């Protein structure tokens, strides 16, 4: 079939298999051009491995460090008549590229919050790798079924303590408008922490340790975003921020548990990028459109693969990691540089529906959004007939 983009709000409901493959190949090309990463991990588990930062971590581990990788995700395959999800095609492309280089790659498709997927992951590590020396936690999901109680939690994007009026951008209609968000209830805050906080990361590491599949000296990191003042009401000071603070608490226990065998656990802070998750957050499309404009002018603009490659080379595997006073690894320092934030803050109140194209890089934001779904990528023939039914070799279906 011939597949065209169909965007509804913050989701594109179609995906292009060849475009996703080209996008993955470009990221692999970037990592390979940078050369091997010294002292990199060789057996890597990525939880949330199919899109965005998790995919970038898998690509960096494999093609920058020469690592065998095991990826966990929850994606939808395509059929002859309907495209699958982007992460499905990204993973199929990754597997093909890894096989060409003789790199081990296996994936598990299922609910990463579940005990079943954790057990299948442990079984795969035991059978194929023995142990892993790096665990990347990059799971982004709106809901979680608790594996012990069966309780269902839904995350909420709300401020805490007071209603907040936020400037936002309707990217479909290119209209700048204010949105009032009512404060989260305590249950909504608790549920968001249950979905997006550190409990599941802790459960993963506990399960891997108990099974003996973590190597001595193993490291783990969970990816997060903190942002600056403009996004703080909805982010750091909101319901999501409560989950981020929980991550900062949970990492202390995980770190102590791994330190006994020479290991380490860190939260890694990455810059704001266009992802399916961030596009759903009020404020973020406008903030990102401004950030793109300012950082491109400065020559410091980066996407997922540049960020994660830098994190691996400088901090996860480097001898002088970028640490903040909380002990987090920081890769977001270019975004948070005073001159970038001052420029974004100055432009923020000036943007209107009339000048949004001129003051921001809305075109760049929209192009980046479509790239997530395999569209607008140079070298891809979008008039060609493609088969959306693409298989993933070496896939365990949970």
Curated annotation (Swiss-Prot):
It catalyses: a 2,3-saturated acyl-[ACP] + NAD(+) = a (2E)-enoyl-[ACP] + NADH + H(+). Disulfide bonds: none annotated. The active site is at residue 235. Substrate binds at residue 225. Its EC number is 1.3.1.9. The keyword Nucleotide-binding does not apply. One of its GO terms (molecular function) is NAD binding. It comes from the Bacteria. Involved in the final reduction of the elongation cycle of fatty acid synthesis (FAS II). Catalyzes the reduction of a carbon-carbon double bond in an enoyl moiety that is covalently linked to an acyl carrier protein (ACP). This is Enoyl-[acyl-carrier-protein] reductase [NADH].
């Amino acid at each position: 079939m011939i597949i065209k983009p169909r965007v509804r709000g913050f989701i594109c409901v179609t995906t292009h298999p060849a475009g996703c493959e080209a996008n993955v190949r470009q990221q692999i090309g970037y990592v390979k051009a940078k050369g091997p990463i010294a002292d990199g991990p060789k057996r890597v588990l990525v939880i949330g491995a199919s899109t965005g930062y998790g995919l970038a971590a898998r690509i960096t581990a494999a093609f920058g460090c020469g690592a065998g990788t095991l990826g966990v995700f929850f994606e939808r395959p395509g059929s002859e008549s309907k495209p699958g999800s982007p992460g499905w095609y990204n993973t199929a492309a990754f597997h093909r590229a890894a096989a060409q280089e003789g790199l081990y790659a296996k994936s598990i498709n299922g609910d990463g919050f579940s005990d079943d997927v954790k057990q299948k992951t442990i079984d795969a590590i035991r059978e194929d790798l023995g142990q892993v020396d790096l665990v990347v936690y990059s799971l982004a999901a709106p809901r979680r079924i608790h594996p012990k109680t069966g309780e269902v939690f839904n995350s909420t994007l709300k401020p805490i303590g007071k209603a907040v009026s936020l400037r936002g951008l309707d990217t479909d209609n290119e209209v700048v408008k204010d949105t009032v968000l009512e404060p989260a209830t305590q249950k909504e805050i608790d549920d968001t922490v249950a979905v997006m906080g550190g409990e599941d990361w802790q459960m993963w590491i506990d399960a891997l340790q108990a099974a003996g599949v973590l190597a001595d000296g193993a490291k783990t990191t969970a990816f997060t975003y903190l942002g600056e003042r403009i996004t703080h009401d909805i982010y750091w000071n909101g319901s999501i921020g409560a989950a981020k603070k929980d991550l900062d608490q949970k990492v202390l226990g995980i770190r102590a548990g791994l330190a006994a065998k020479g290991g380490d656990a860190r939260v890694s802070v990455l810059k704001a990028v266009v992802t399916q998750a961030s596009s759903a957050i009020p404020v973020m499309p406008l903030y990102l459109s401004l950030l793109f404009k300012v950082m491109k002018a400065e020559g410091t603009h980066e996407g997922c693969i540049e960020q994660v490659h830098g994190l691996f080379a400088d901090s996860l595997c480097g001898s002088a990691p970028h640490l903040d006073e909380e002990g987090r690894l920081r890769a977001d320092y270019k975004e948070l540089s005073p001159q970038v934030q001052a420029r974004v803050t100055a432009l923020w109140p000036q943007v209107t529906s009339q000048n949004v194209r001129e003051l921001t890089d809305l075109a760049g934001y929209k192009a980046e959004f479509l790239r997530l779904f395999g569209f607008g990528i140079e070298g891809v023939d979008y008039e060609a007939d493609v088969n959306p039914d693409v298989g993933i070799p070496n896939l365990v279906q949970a």
